[in-house]
Amino acid sequence: MSAHTRITRKTVTAIRSTKGIGSLVSLTAYSAPMAKLVDEVADVIIVGDSVGMVLYGMPDTLRVTLDMMIAHGAAVVRGAAQACVVVDLPFSTFQESPAQAYRSAARLLAETGAQAVKLEGGCEMTDTIRFLTDRGIPVMAHVGLMPQQANAAGGFRAQGMDPRSAAQVFDAACAAERAGAFSVVIEGTAEALARHLTETLTIPTIGIGASPACDGQVLVTEDMIGAFDAYTPRFVKRYADANAVMRDAIRQYAHDVRQRVFPEPAHCFGYGKPLQLADAATAA
């Protein structure tokens, strides 16, 4: 690639236009180095509030703050060159009113450089999504299993498994589309429901524990590569065991330090050369 070749970042319009064409690849990232790696293949990078559990050891996502999302979102934007970057609106920063959601979303986009925000919610969020999209803030909706509402739902339980629950998820996704969302994440739902939503909606569906029929898939990267093992959802496929690789490297380093075989000459400056010290008068 020449020095003059310019990489164009995928826009929300481009993402929306993929409906029914191929399959969108989406992963999470919370740092610039991870974003750079994921950016090689991803169409969409989601800076999820899952950062609280994955990086900070929190028991859930409820303690994640807007400032945290801004810091991690900005890092991801710096690391990613071509993927569309979407940042989560964390708990308590958008539920109070559309105006509150706008203030939070405006800060996220202005201070991170991301392309869109993602928010969890059912039909009660319809007015908020419309308020944001009417004011130029692209929104990715999130329906089905919603981690921010896990307490009210009695835990992390699959949704849409009975007719009433399925209707609620279906109505929420359709309402989000009508309100202007450019795509929707469908998490932890009955496969038939996710498939039906994908066939019904005119915006891309991105599944996580949903259906292979969705217009795209997303996983938490640390789950997928085996770097986070505190809890593994049943819908995660592990493609590597990063923890094992890192653990072996750390143990080898500790062994080499204790045996004084690290650092080697190649890791030192002027190894083997005699010490030369200027006297105090000369140095002054």
From Swiss-Prot:
Mg(2+) binds at D49, D88, E120. Its main location: cytoplasm. The keyword Metal-binding applies. The active site is at E187. One of its GO terms (molecular function) is 3-methyl-2-oxobutanoate hydroxymethyltransferase activity. Pathway: Cofactor biosynthesis; (R)-pantothenate biosynthesis; (R)-pantoate from 3-methyl-2-oxobutanoate: step 1/2. Its EC number is 2.1.2.11. It catalyses: 3-methyl-2-oxobutanoate + (6R)-5,10-methylene-5,6,7,8-tetrahydrofolate + H2O = 2-dehydropantoate + (6S)-5,6,7,8-tetrahydrofolate. Disulfide bonds: none annotated. Belongs to the PanB family. Catalyzes the reversible reaction in which hydroxymethyl group from 5,10-methylenetetrahydrofolate is transferred onto alpha-ketoisovalerate to form ketopantoate. This is 3-methyl-2-oxobutanoate hydroxymethyltransferase 2.
